[in-house]
Amino acid sequence: MEFSCVHFLQNKTILVTGATGFLAKVFVEKILRVQPNVNKLYLVVRASDNEAATKRLRTEAFEKDLFKVLRDNLGDEKLNTLLSEKVVPVAGDIAMDHLGMKDSNLRERMQKEIDIVVNVAATTNFDERYDIGLGINTFGALNVLNFAKKCVKAQLLLHVSTAYVCGEKPGLLPEKPFVMEEICNENGLQLDINLERELMKQRLKELNEQGCSEEGTTFYMKELGMERAKLHGWPNTYVFTKSMGEMLLGNHKENLPLVIIRPTMITSTLFEPFPGWIEGLRTVDSVIIAYGKGVLKCFLVDVNSVCDMIPADMVANAMIAAAATHAGGSKVHMVYQVGSSHQNPIIYGEIREILFCYFTKNSLRSRNGSMITVSKMKLIPTLALFSLYMTIRYKLPVQLLKLVDIIYPSREGDEYKNKNRKIDMVMRLVKLYEPYVLFKGIFDDRNTKNLCAKQKEEDNRNSENFMFDFDPKIIKWKDYLINVHIPGLITHVLKK
């Protein structure tokens, strides 16, 4: 790294896809805050036209609390001026050729100006429709690469993936690119990405010919995605399609420098722009909130498994540092796994104790205003034991309530429906999170560790006071969860 990240960002023109997503917004806010002399940020969002894209960015990004530090520092007028001068909203869709941009003049101008392409666009639904997952996570990534190749000044494509592209492998998981020719399942079945697309198209055609409803088509396309993922050794459609996206990028990058960022479970900001900002319930957050509300009393978890989390601002810092390091490099194909399991692990057993401590002292309130009392969550280490426990402890009593409902419908009907809904919610969470809560892998992050060390040297040399720190060892997990992350969820997600 020959100069600081702040200097690197100066006068750069950067394209960011998926710009209304959680991580992309943290990334964009950081750039605007630390380097207002960035030349231009082209922000691609799905919208009918550029006017709609502008409105969507304003309401879903710039008016959010995330930008309050910039707003407080600059004032409304100066912030609006900065945004109008530096940000260009672009209506687009990476699932389409030319990123779905209809304005050819704008597209040509972008391809003359852009220095760095950052692909953050993704669908993160674990059980996404296979056609949508392939369209965005797999071939959408290839569309971004093809666009980047047409940018005459392009110095780098930075692609955000996920650490869980590894599948369900145990042990130390290498920080290296996929080699497509080596990808086959335990029975030796070779993965053919083009065949996967053809299978998806054929199934979609069959469903259309059968006159299947939209709801039915969604169901069957979700089933197909999960079926194909598990056949090839991945737990769900999300990580399977993200894996194939990485493979296509590696195979088709040619001479364009390529950096792949693989974050683990992204959580609320640790420091910047302020502690605790988050949007939506992400991965373990659904479990945290359900527990705090008294809905979740038991869960499928190995108490000794590591919960690999990383704050969003650390991921954004790693993205900027990686771009500054590799932009313009020859034949670069670098992978950075950004997580905490290797250097600063926390196990689910510790998290259970922290959650019990927090919600005992900071009880949430029910709809009628009463305080919700939580007990220590029961953690069950296997799916078979969990299913047995749920049947004996909850399902059989609920069936008795159903019988009462039939005999005395006005008496216990609401209680039966309420309890049944809670059971369904728990089982849905368990099925979605099973591959992660029983995960036995640790993510090797030597590349990221070396990058972080170099970044700290640069920050020291340039008196930037660790402005781009992403060292997981600085996270004090108990303090972070109790004083930052859970309060952030309650403030920014539950709006309480």
Swiss-Prot record:
CDD domains assigned: FAR-N_SDR_e, FAR_C
Gene3D superfamilies for this protein: NAD(P)-binding Rossmann-like Domain (3.40.50.720)
GO biological process, one term: lipid metabolic process
Domain of life: Eukaryota
Reactions accelerated catalytically: a long-chain fatty acyl-CoA + 2 NADPH + 2 H(+) = a long-chain primary fatty alcohol + 2 NADP(+) + CoA
InterPro entries xrefs: FAR, FAR_C, Far_NAD-bd, NAD(P)-bd_dom_sf
Transmembrane is among the record's keywords: no
UniProt GO molecular function: alcohol-forming long-chain fatty acyl-CoA reductase activity; alcohol-forming very long-chain fatty acyl-CoA reductase activity
The keyword Oxidoreductase appears for this protein: yes
Keywords, comma-separated and alphabetical: Lipid biosynthesis, Lipid metabolism, NADP, Oxidoreductase
EC number, UniProt record: 1.2.1.84
Similarity remark: Belongs to the fatty acyl-CoA reductase family.
Biological role: Catalyzes the reduction of fatty acyl-CoA to fatty alcohols. Catalyzes specifically the formation of C16:0 fatty alcohol.
PANTHER family attached to this UniProt entry: FATTY ACYL-COA REDUCTASE 8-RELATED, MALE STERILITY PROTEIN 2-RELATED
Protein name as annotated: Fatty acyl-CoA reductase 8
The organism of origin for this protein: Arabidopsis thaliana
Taxon lineage: Eukaryota, Viridiplantae, Streptophyta, Embryophyta, Tracheophyta
Name of the gene this protein is made from: FAR8
